[in-house]
């Protein structure tokens, strides 16, 4: 993982098969999503020296399995509060994904205290109710995590502005998607305004944010079938280079 400042954004795993990240400041941290099994997630936390007792809660972006697959077993073994939009919490509760004893807390737009952190949710354009998170850390930094969005709407633009770090979806390369094995309906879903953000769309937004003063970025939720890390990075470098911006690879 990468250390950006005292507060850290750490991707535990990311991609089509599962997504989870950590926002950490000192000994306290938040988990955002848990899309792989409890063994994978627990091993990733242990490798970072993170004890569950130091976690202030789990933030859930939406109900898709690549974001919640590991929650059920993890929460049977560990007692942590879960935060999210009302529709997502209702889904988790009604489908038995979270234990009946689990504390569920709605986050609906205004900033709320989640342990040592200030957390504000904002809606993203996806094919189920979905949110991103703007997080204020105890050391005064601001991070925004925005994945699973087909288009950059005004609430997303607002949430991405003025951050110390932005973790933004760079899901697919358009050529790989259109020339790949996916059936038409699935390609259309991914490309739609309720699907996912392409490398080109992500890169254009990163250029805007750099021009506004943001300096730290993480590319997230890369498709294993329709993208590669090298291609996502090269798209960013090409976009920035065309604008005369020289990026640093961290």
Indicate residue ranges for each PLM-predicted region:
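Metallo-beta-lactamase
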Residues: 86-140
């Amino acid at each position: 993982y990468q250390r950006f400042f005292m507060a850290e954004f750490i991707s535990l795993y990311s991609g089509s098969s599962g997504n989870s990240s950590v926002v950490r400041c000192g000994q306290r941290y938040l988990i955002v999503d848990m899309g792989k099994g409890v063994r994978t997630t627990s091993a990733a936390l242990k490798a970072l020296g993170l004890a569950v007792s130091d976690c202030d809660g789990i933030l859930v972006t939406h109900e898709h399995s690549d974001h919640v697959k590991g929650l059920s077993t993890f929460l049977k073994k560990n007692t942590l509060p879960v935060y999210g939009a009302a529709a997502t919490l209702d889904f988790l509760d009604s489908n038995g994904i979270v234990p009946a004893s689990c504390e569920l807390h709605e986050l609906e737009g205004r900033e709320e205290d989640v342990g040592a952190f200030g957390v504000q949710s904002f809606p993203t354009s996806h094919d189920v109710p979905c949110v991103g998170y703007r997080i204020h850390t105890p050391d005064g930094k601001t991070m925004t995590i925005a994945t699973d969005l087909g288009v950059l709407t005004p609430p997303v633009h607002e949430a991405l502005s003025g951050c110390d770090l932005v973790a933004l979806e760079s899901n697919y390369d358009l050529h790989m998607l259109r020339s790949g094995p996916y059936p038409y309906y699935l390609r259309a879903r991914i490309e739609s305004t309720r699907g996912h953000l392409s490398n080109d769309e992500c890169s254009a937004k990163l250029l805007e944010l750099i021009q506004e003063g943001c300096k730290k970025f993480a590319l997230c939720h890369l498709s294993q079938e329709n993208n590669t890390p090298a291609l996502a990075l090269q798209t960013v470098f090409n976009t920035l280079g065309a604008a005369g911006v020289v990026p640093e690879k961290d």
